[in-house]
């Protein structure tokens, strides 16, 4: 099971899930990452093991 947390290093709207994933894994120690719609825009969300 994964817990999601907004990226702490991504700024602005997320338009590239691949780049978001790489940044979550490389910079934040997450297992995965993707662009998800969170009001008011697409955000980079990182996924961690709960």
From Swiss-Prot:
Keywords: Antibiotic, Antimicrobial, Disulfide bond, Fungicide, Plant defense, Secreted. The keyword Disulfide bond applies. GO terms for cellular component: extracellular region. It holds the Pfam family Gamma-thionin. Contains 4 disulfide bonds. Its main location: secreted. One of its GO terms (biological process) is defense response to Gram-negative bacterium. This is Defensin D2. It comes from Nigella sativa (Black cumin).
């Amino acid at each position: 099971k994964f817990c999601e947390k907004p990226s702490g290093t991504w700024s602005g709207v997320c338009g590239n899930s691949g780049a978001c994933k790489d940044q979550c894994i490389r910079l934040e120690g997450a297992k995965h990452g993707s662009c998800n719609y969170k009001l008011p825009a697409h955000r980079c969300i990182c996924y961690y093991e709960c």
